[in-house]
Amino acid sequence: MRERTTELVQGFRHSVPYINAHRGKKFVIMLSGEAIKYGNFSGIINDIGLLHSLGIRLIVVYGSCPQINANLKEKNIKITYHKYIRVTDLLSLEQVKQAAGRLQLDITARLSMSLSNTPLQGANINVVSGNFIIAQPLGVDDGIDYCHSGRIRRIDKKAINCQLENGAIVLIGPVAVSVTGESFNLTSEEIATQVSIKLKAEKMIGFCSKQGVIDSQGKTISELLPNNIQNEIKKLEGKGDYISSTIRFLRGSIKACKSGVNRSHLISYHKNGALLQELFSRDGIGTQMVMESAEKIRQANINDIGGILELIRPLEKKGILVRRSREQLEMEVDKFTIIERDNLTIACAALYPFFKEKIGEMACVAVHPDYRNSSRGDLLLQTMKLNAKKLNLKKIFVLTTQSIHWFQERGFILVDVEILPESKKKMYNYQRCSKILMIDLF
């Protein structure tokens, strides 16, 4: 019981900064038809209701592709695509409207009761739908008439903002009308992307069948920049994937990132609570798409002393690192490089140059426990090498008692104490008996 209480307290402490940061912000959530079909949809709806109760302004955009296809098959209506875009003739349009209308009612009903059987029972959630999107036809391409398949002509952002300010969740479906009163079938990814851009949303969030974007080892890629997103799209297309919820969202996320949407998140609709884990934890659970990495490597300054101390004190107590006083750190802070993630220092290292011998010491290497099975150590080493070269140093050495093999795997070789610069040799602690490893930079 005590362990569970401790976990709850720690989890809440870690979540509070994100609760405060997200309050009042606009999030666009894209629910694919596949996500709506899946058994965990009730959990997703409950989490959306919880986000609303925390003061986050929500626009929910839903798709209905599998539901439309099911309707068409039931009515024996041919399903036609051109360049991976549905051709919506009059017969198909009726089934599109039927599927979209049914989902609108279902999602509205579920959101309205999402906080029942919770401590927030009794809190009302207003869900508003309307003609927020004005559509226009896609027209004819290569002799193929898309009929009632359309694209966005304009978005009534004033009306959407008005509903958000009144505390409502705005729900937008895939059917929109034109200035002539005709109905058109739009893609949910276009709506979600353009709404995110026009309303200057903080985040665009999508759901897929996997835990975000998966690499060749089967692991989730936690962060992608636009160029990397494009590479992932090419990989998926190379496998014949042109219309999955993953690739559709990735295409939209590139436009969103380049147009000012801070972050786009892709998470699994299979995983219960994925939405909350992604938004209220430092590392999330899926893949986020950003213009600029949430993680930065930079030279430390005096304001980073507290973060460095939190990182190195546990290692000093274990005898892994030599103890440094706060005063010493303050005098030497310009020697330190840190990796920072969401204002948390997650790794550090220092470079002490010996200009006479043209050698540098890499020291005080520390990585936060949550990130030790990652590449942060390699990133620090690479940065230390670059910094040393800028100072015209020819070699780097380290003194270590615990990480001998790690450095050897990266090209360092064991050397004798006599190789050290004279001033460092005089300070060598023979009782500690640290191993000395060195690497040539040129």
From Swiss-Prot:
Keyword Zinc assigned: no
Broad class of where this protein is predominantly found: cytoplasm
Domain (N-acetyltransferase) ranges: 295-442
EC number in record: 2.3.1.1
The organism's place on the tree of life at top rank: Bacteria
Catalyzed reactions per annotation: L-glutamate + acetyl-CoA = N-acetyl-L-glutamate + CoA + H(+)
Pathway annotation: Amino-acid biosynthesis; L-arginine biosynthesis; N(2)-acetyl-L-ornithine from L-glutamate: step 1/4
Gene Ontology molecular function, alphabetical: L-glutamate N-acetyltransferase activity
Subcellular location(s) per record: Cytoplasm
One annotated Gene Ontology cellular component of this protein: cytoplasm
Sorted UniProt keywords: Acyltransferase, Amino-acid biosynthesis, Arginine biosynthesis, Cytoplasm, Transferase
GO biological process, one term: L-arginine biosynthetic process
Protein family per UniProt: Belongs to the acetyltransferase family. ArgA subfamily.
Quaternary data: Homohexamer.
HAMAP family: N_acetyl_glu_synth
Name of the protein: Amino-acid acetyltransferase
Taxonomic lineage from the root: Bacteria, Pseudomonadati, Pseudomonadota, Gammaproteobacteria, Enterobacterales
